[in-house]
């Protein structure tokens, strides 16, 4: 199985100026996934506008994998506390913007 961080769509996401961090969570982060398990991503983009998030979703929708990708936006208050806690418990940081 290909390393999640090596997918081209992850590289494209990292190039977006408003993306601060990309986290893998869920079964793939825990290592108890099946071959066809989905990819769960949490993307922190504190300063992104809704139109910026649409760019993220376009990249995800056109990803270089046939696996299903579930993507949640961090930095919005819409996540339930339970989901956020599960993300924090499982998270593997795939990318973190270098702060100057």
What are these regions (language model features)?
Residues 40-42:
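Short, well-ordered beta-strand segments
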Residues 1-21, 29-35, 46-100:
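Catalytic core of pol beta-like nucleotidyltransferases
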């Amino acid at each position: 199985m290909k390393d999640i961080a090596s997918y081209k769509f992850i590289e494209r996401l990292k190039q977006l100026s408003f993306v601060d961090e990309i986290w893998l969570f869920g079964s793939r982060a825990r290592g108890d996934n099946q071959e066809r398990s989905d990819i769960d991503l949490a993307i922190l983009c504190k300063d992104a506008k809704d139109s910026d998030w649409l760019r993220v979703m376009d990249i995800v929708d056109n990803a270089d994998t046939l696996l299903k990708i579930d993507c949640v936006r961090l930095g919005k208050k819409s996540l339930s506390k339970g989901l956020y806690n599960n993300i924090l418990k499982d998270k593997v940081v795939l990318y973190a913007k270098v702060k100057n």
